Amino acid sequence: MAKEDSIRMQGVIVDTLPNTMFRVELENGHVVTAHISGKMRKHYIRILTGDKVTVELTPYDLNKGRIVYRER
């Protein structure tokens, strides 16, 4: 997946799932399942319920995404 093909949206973590997966409610109201990107995993960035995050979605599957940034 090329970076220019991805869709970035803001959201809030609603639920924590096993295997570092999270349920994220996007700003438009949709709920998606997202995992942490590799750089966030490498730097041990912790994500908790209620955190504001930026999620990358692919145009092919809008139900799954990748968390690329956590707001401070």
From Swiss-Prot:
Database matches in PROSITE patterns: S1_IF1_TYPE (PS50832)
UniProt keyword list: Cytoplasm, Initiation factor, Protein biosynthesis, RNA-binding, rRNA-binding
Domain S1-like: 1-72
Entry keyword annotation includes RNA-binding: yes
GO molecular function terms listed in the Swiss-Prot or TrEMBL record: ribosome binding; rRNA binding; translation initiation factor activity
Pfam families: eIF-1a
Protein's cellular compartments: Cytoplasm
Keyword RNA-binding assigned: yes
GO cellular component: cytosol
Family: Belongs to the IF-1 family.
Family matches, as NCBIfam families: infA
Alphabetical list of HAMAP family matching this protein: IF_1
Job of this protein: One of the essential components for the initiation of protein synthesis. Stabilizes the binding of IF-2 and IF-3 on the 30S subunit to which N-formylmethionyl-tRNA(fMet) subsequently binds. Helps modulate mRNA selection, yielding the 30S pre-initiation complex (PIC). Upon addition of the 50S ribosomal subunit IF-1, IF-2 and IF-3 are released leaving the mature 70S translation initiation complex.
Complex and partners: Component of the 30S ribosomal translation pre-initiation complex which assembles on the 30S ribosome in the order IF-2 and IF-3, IF-1 and N-formylmethionyl-tRNA(fMet); mRNA recruitment can occur at any time during PIC assembly.
PANTHER family: TRANSLATION INITIATION FACTOR IF-1, CHLOROPLASTIC
The protein, known as: Translation initiation factor IF-1
